[in-house]
Amino acid sequence: MSFKMTQNQYTSLYGPTVGDSIRLGDTNLFAQIEKDYAVYGEEATFGGGKSIRDGMAQNPRVTRDDVNVADLVISNAVIIDYDKVVKADIGIKNGYIFAIGNAGNPDIMDNVDIIIGSTTDIIAAEGKIVTAGGIDTHVHFINPEQAEVALESGITTHIGGGTGASEGSKATTVTPGPWHIHRMLEAAEGLPINVGFTGKGQATNPTALIEQINAGAIGLKVHEDWGATPSALSHALDVADEFDVQIALHADTLNEAGFMEDTMAAVKDRVLHMYHTEGAGGGHAPDLIKSAAFSNILPSSTNPTLPYTHNTVDEHLDMVMITHHLNAAIPEDIAFADSRIRKETIAAEDVLQDMGVFSMISSDSQAMGRVGEVITRTWQVAHRMKEQRGPLDGDFEHNDNNRIKRYIAKYTINPAITHGISEYVGSIEPGKLADIVLWDPIFFGVKPELVVKGGLINSAVNGDANGSIPTSEPMKYRKMYGQYGGNLTSTSMTFVSKTAYENGINRALNLKRMVRPVKNIRQLSKADMKNNSATPKLDVDPQTYEVYVDGEKITSNAATELPLTQRYFLF
């Protein structure tokens, strides 16, 4: 005999199901469940009187040797990813996702993809949202504490360069030369996130570039503070093509060695990652933004200009002066800073993100950007654009799935593809490292509930260790066992070039972390950017700095109020 319950009763027990919508934080965005993998009436839930007990949803006879027996099941989660908004159980084994589907005991339950046995732990995600760990591809490695701050925001991978609080690191995402690269690879052993380092891309002698790739750099950064000349860029791209690594470009703001057209002529048709493509973070003034129309350019934004608010322009001048070691007593330095801050191109940036013309969002950590705000600012932009531009095509009331998939791709799968690590991270898919972020919908985009790193809980909101229950105040982020002992190295990856990997860089430096090679980079094009591959004609008026897409002027209004702000940071 079947049992009937109301939709509210079902949701309170098992979370939302097909057709239900979840509001993301206090934004105007709603995610609607497209598919539910559960068999109604056979949902696996943990707790007193619940179904995950011996002989019920937990199989009493299987052992861990069975490939379908999970080490960890995240039950009844709403998965938001670049290609799906679904309700499912997630099976994790040996630190990797092995299945997305229905968990339980196949002896008594139908359509079981993931077996729960006596060796299985449970994270109850009923009513919660799960996303892939975020990837920040514009990190200045200035301060190792950035890793913890980012982790507590939902970011699990950092890509960039630096050696600490040097002037070179403060201004440029560069880890220069084999000695520094090796020291940073060793330092990464103590970080609770995945990392990859970019070397310095300025040299006419290819040997000076190749030795950095051989040392383990996953790519090269060409930055104007070291000289972003067409010659330097072309030489760096030659080496990148040979070794299948990425080039990240911070182009020539002052147009000293050439204009945007000269840079693109040096690039030819070769792929590169264009940093802060709007230009406030640096790059050809005033028209770097036009590069996003090229099919070989993978464009990203950094978060200080996102979203456009009434404070954005005012705060940027001082940031530029400090970050790039400029002197306020020198008129030319002031002019340099002023040339980068253009409210018209900043106002267009949000719209280009919403149209899928810009493909990624990153931080520019401590070098104008905020390492813990990539995810928050991404969703603030999505909110603002829905507010100003209305629903995207295919979206409707209480269903913003197309916009949600577009925006989540900007800090998950697209950065992973761009830097050749999408085989390992960037989405909730079988075969990938279990870097997973769990959110209470109320706090989505601001404060995760916990972070699973390589299959083990790495960081979580938890109470006083002397409390009688785990929610005793003060509730705050605390390091979990994933950050202790050998787990620090067994749950995170260090990414290196293929040549360094094949030559045994892990053995040469006695690295304990999982070392993996980047791959499949040089054949990329913008068409590979998920949900963010638009290449319209872009123009910038050289006098007014107004931006045009296919001949139509685009802009946005400066926000005076945003979601995901003060109400979440009272304590």
UniProtKB/Swiss-Prot annotation:
Reaction equation(s) it catalyzes: urea + 2 H2O + H(+) = hydrogencarbonate + 2 NH4(+)
Spell out the post-translational modification annotation for this entry. Answer: Carboxylation allows a single lysine to coordinate two nickel ions.
One GO CC term, this protein: cytoplasm
Which Pfam families would you find in this protein's record? Amidohydro_1, Urease_alpha
Query: SUPFAM superfamilies in the record, alphabetically?
Result: Composite domain of metallo-dependent hydrolases, Metallo-dependent hydrolases
What's the source species for this entry? Staphylococcus aureus (strain NCTC 8325 / PS 47)
Query: What is one process in the GO biological process aspect for this record?
Result: urea catabolic process
What positions are modified (N6-carboxylysine)? 221
Which residues are noted in the entry as Ni(2+) 1-binding? 138, 140, 221, 364
Query: Residues in domain Urease?
Result: 133-571
Taxonomic lineage from the root:
Bacteria, Bacillati, Bacillota, Bacilli, Bacillales
In which compartments does the protein localize? Answer: Cytoplasm
Q: Which GO terms describe its molecular function?
A: nickel cation binding; urease activity
Q: Where along the chain is Ni(2+) 2 bound?
A: 221, 250, 276
The record describes its quaternary structure and partners as:
Heterotrimer of UreA (gamma), UreB (beta) and UreC (alpha) subunits. Three heterotrimers associate to form the active enzyme.
Sorted alphabetically, which InterPro entries does this protein's record hold?
Answer: Amidohydro-rel (IPR006680), Metal-dep_hydrolase_composite (IPR011059), Metal_Hydrolase (IPR032466), Urease_alpha_N_dom (IPR011612), Urease_alpha_subunit (IPR050112), Urease_AS (IPR017950), Urease_asu (IPR005848), Urease_asu_c (IPR017951)
Active site residues according to the UniProt entry = 324
| Protein's UniProt keywords contain Hydrolase | yes
Q: What class of enzyme is it?
A: hydrolase
What does the record give as its pathway? Nitrogen metabolism; urea degradation; CO(2) and NH(3) from urea (urease route): step 1/1
Any keyword Hydrolase? yes
User: What is this protein's record name?
Assistant: Urease subunit alpha
Q: What is its EC number?
A: 3.5.1.5
Binding residues annotated for substrate, in chain numbering: 223
Q: What keywords appear on the UniProt entry? A: Cytoplasm, Hydrolase, Metal-binding, Nickel
Q: How is the cofactor bound?
A: Binds 2 nickel ions per subunit.
Entry cofactors: Ni cation
